[in-house]
Regions:
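Gram-positive cell-envelope targeting signals
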Residues: 1-47
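Substrate-binding cleft of extracellular glycoside hydrolase catalytic domains
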Residues: 48-176
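Conserved acidic, small-residue-rich alpha-beta core segments centered on
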Residues: 169, 181-184
Length: 184
């Protein structure tokens, strides 16, 4: 069985975080929207699309609906284990469908091997369960927390291997009929 890292927090940590969560979420959402708006004006992009995950908490989609033209929703991270599903993914997809907001999805990859990519492919397909996200299915290859590097993958030296992982994911999603890309 392939295992991915587990992240846990104590109840005390969660209580502290809750007090700051709403304020920090508002700041982060404002910054993200500002960056998106700057990108739009610089590159003449015609759509405002935001990235959301359980880190954004319980989103009031009725308020966001009029400000976005699309959403990219994190559906999970790592291997095909329910504990690594994004806790808000199903709700976020349902809300976008209810309100007619075009959305795509992404999985944050922790893959170190081809077998782990296969597990992440299965994770993605399980979470989609027949949905058809019009903004595509994305393979997030960032290493924001340093997991890949701390486990021996170097983005500069192992570029060919990481490219193979991306190709493996894209080919599997294409075979299932999804528009697919790499989110990095």
């Amino acid at each position: 069985m392939i295992k991915s890292p587990k992240f846990t927090h104590s109840k005390k940590d969660n209580n502290k975080a809750q007090g700051r969560s709403a304020h920090l979420t508002a700041i982060v959402v404002s910054l993200v929207l500002s960056i998106i708006m700057i990108t739009i004006s610089v590159f003449n992009v015609s759509a405002v699309v935001i990235d959301v995950s359980s880190h954004d908490g319980l989103i009031d989609w009725n308020r966001i609906e009029e400000h976005v033209e699309g959403v990219i929703i994190r559906i999970g991270y790592g291997n095909d284990i329910e504990g690594q599903d994004d806790k808000q993914a199903i709700r976020n997809m349902n809300e976008c469908e209810r309100l007619g907001i075009p959305y795509g999805v992404y999985i944050y990859s922790y893959a170190l091997t081809s077998d782990e990519v296969t597990s992440e492919i299965n994770h993605t397909l399980r979470m989609l369960q027949g949905r058809s996200p019009v903004r595509g299915v994305w393979f997030d290859m960032e290493d924001a927390d340093g997991y890949k590097e701390s486990n021996g993958l170097d983005v500069y030296k192992d570029g060919e291997l990481l490219t193979d992982f991306c190709i493996q994911f894209i080919e599997a999603m294409d075979k299932e009929g999804y528009k697919t890309g790499v989110y990095a």
